[in-house]
Amino acid sequence: MCGINGIVSFHASAPPIDADELTRTREAMRSRGPDAAGTWLSPDRRVGFGHRRLSIIDVSERANQPMVSREGDAVLTFNGEIYNYAALREELEREGERFDTTSDTEVVLRMYRKRGAAMLPQLRGMFAFAIWDARTSTLFLARDPYGIKPLYYANDGKTFRFASQVKAILAGGGVSTSRDPAGIIGFLLRGHVPEPFTIYEAIRELPAGSSMVVTRDGPSAPRSYFSLATVLRDAVNARRRYSDGERAEIIARAVRESVRYHLVSDVPVGAFLSAGRDSGTIVALATETGIPLQTVTLRFEEYAGTHKDEAPLAAVAAREYGTIHQTQTLSAEMFRRSLPHALEAMDQPSLDGINSYFVCKAAAELGWKVALSGTGGDELFGGYSTFRIIPRVLRTFGLFRHLPTVAKAFTRMQPRMARNRARFSPKTAYTLKYCTSYEGAYLMKRGLFLPDDVSSVVGEEMAREGLQRLGIMELIREAITPDPGTPFTRVAALESSLFLRSQLLRDIDWASMAHSLEVRVPLVDAFLLREVAPAVISMAGRNGKELLAAAPKQPLPAAILERKKSGFTVPLRDWLSHDRDVTKQFGGRPWALYVLDAGGHFAVAR
């Protein structure tokens, strides 16, 4: 895992690159790569790359970046890991390619020179990278299918800048810091800033599963090479049928293979362990490979003796699979002391991520460089309540479209219900307005504020401009375009393309990189998705998490299998008891406003 950045002065009237800006941007990402730093400038100073390295595969200096091809005609700055790089390297060697390192970075560079953008679907891993191709005077950028690794860019019409973090681009000093109403409104609606927006007008995020090029004419529009909705639609259309045994075998084999790939490393790999099925399955499958595995669990004093305390069951799983286990306890005082750093590391405002920040901190304090996480299991195997609730809501409220008298009566009641917050939740008044489509029902279920509410937070003018620029319903609809085909696959596409991508994965990235830790997610893998999607879809509404938990040869402890799902939460209400505005009516909304007001570089004056 690393931090990458670069500048391209593509327009003839643009000044040569300021090497100091390149360095400032790079050094703003020091925690992403404490092991090495590098800079490359083209002879005409029209192109420059920076890199901060966290050494995981081929830890020698010869694998440092930016990496220049043997021919001198291509330069790469790369962030992430390619788990199948060894097989790809063997394939290239059979075609006559020679290598100077044993790194996955060089495999990407050699593949690009040979195959160009056509290589992207062959890369199994998490990545964001940029390649300067001197043969065509073109900058090529790409991001992994799920967007596990971030990539932000800014274009002022003459100069193109990119980096792994928003705050790194800002640190360079070459872009405007004007806030983007769309990014702010997006955060208030969703609890995160929806891709491709950021909190700044000048900075955008390259969408997951896409690439783009920058030529002398400037940047092209991002081009998608992976569509999750398409993969799910194709799996539905295949109409495959399986016996229970066949289905279980397919899922077990595919998940086991993904875990094996995610263990590829030249440094030790650990794993986060909770009381849930996802992390337990990952740990069980990792230990099947025979490696000595360290695990860590985060516990909170406030949860001791309650259902939310995951430490006791995590310890049971650790004993079951023979891991070297540590339990780290987080107190309110430790939280308050670390909160300013957490908010500064956040990069973009997020409703979540504090839990990830502290478990990554615990792993880093144990000396880890790489950790496995069970993130992604709920989206892939239907573990969230949204898989049941959203189709049910649509069936119920969809009837109102055919009952105009009832619909009109409900519509007339909306203003009164919205004002009477003592009797009605903020969302209740707008149920009929939104719950007649998948995008509307998803916004109601996962949303923080609703479009009708945000003016009370930021004022009428910003709300109007932000909503217009954001187009939240169209943004959500894109996640299920093309139509994945069934209620299950529509919700899976929504959860994976929105909540997982722009919330969970982004939070894992900033939280882990703040502690120079690489977090890998074996259940978030495009190769795995293609393998298991037909089998999961064929379950006809049953919970796929049961088959995920059945994947290990040595079953998960019965207490974990029987435990009611609770999610990985932190006791924020107790920790922020000193702040009456937050705790007086605690929930997602007050915490979101706290983050927006108290955040680091992105703090917004309201």
What are these regions (language model features)?
Residues 1-347, 356, 553-563, 586-606:
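Cysteine-centered catalytic environments shared across enzyme families
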Residues 340-344, 386-389, 575-577:
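Short low-complexity, flexible loop/linker segments enriched in glycine and/or proline
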Residues 273, 374, 500:
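Conserved S/T- and glycine-rich ATP-binding loop of Class I adenylate-forming
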Residues 145, 157, 358-421, 443, ...:
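Active-site adenylate/phosphate-handling loop in enzymes that bind or generate adenylated species
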Residues 91, 172, 380-383, 531-532:
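Residues that scaffold the ATP/ADP-binding catalytic core of kinase and kinase-like folds
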Residues 1-4, 10, 23-24, 43, ...:
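Adenosyl-5′-phosphate
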